[in-house]
Amino acid sequence: MLPVGPDSPLLPRRAPRTRRHRWPVTLQHGEIVLAPLRQRDGGAWERVRRENSAWLRPWEATLPPGSDPGPATFTGLVRTLSHQAREGRMLPWLVWLEPGGDRKRARLAGQLTVSGIVGGSASWGQIGYWVDQRLAGRGIIPTAVALAVDYCFGAMGLNRIEIAIRPENVRSLRVVAKLGFRPEGLRPRYLHIDGDWRDHLVFALNAEEVPEGLLRRWDNLRRP
């Protein structure tokens, strides 16, 4: 899992140009909503992060000694991510659960970011996410990932999406397995996580592998 907190070490790079993408973007499928971070979401974001601190700590990005600190507040985080999103370098979303499609009952479930977006001969991006422990295992993150992947392959015109996961993160490994991401092996000491450089397993998906869309494939798999 690539963490997407204020200290994320993933630096976005030059983005592709597309006529079909213009930030801000909100995506929805059933009760799952991907919405841009807003300043008014700060209270909910800080509360969920605080309540899940022990759950998230083993998978959280940390900064190597000597690194420049990232935004220190949620306000700064929103400004930084929004600027990079408008430039097409990343897609930062909060993941909301809306029971019965009722926005008044919306509950913050987690966060998902597509970062490191590049165009040209590379045309790819990386997905990172986290979820509230109390909502884990309910299909929220697989649905959110499928929504994001379809948007990247469609509106963004990307060719490849990667997800890097620590081998110990069994729950996150289940997400990519359910969605049919292709395993590509181990990258030793790939990201600075929980205070040290950690090995990660890399999983990828190319646009031609899901011509019908990842969300449709995921929905078909969930049907009894």
PLM-predicted stretches and their roles:
Residues 1-44, 48-55, 92-224:
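Acyl-donor (CoA/ACP) binding surface of acyl/acetyltransferases
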Residues 65-66, 78-94:
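A short helix-loop-beta-strand connector motif used in the catalytic cores of GNAT acetyltransferases and
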Residues 37, 48, 66-73, 87:
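Generic, well-ordered alpha-helical segments
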Residues 48, 59, 77-80, 84, ...:
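Residues that form generic nucleotide/phosphate-binding pockets
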Residues 57-79:
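Conserved GNAT-fold acetyl-CoA-binding loop/helix
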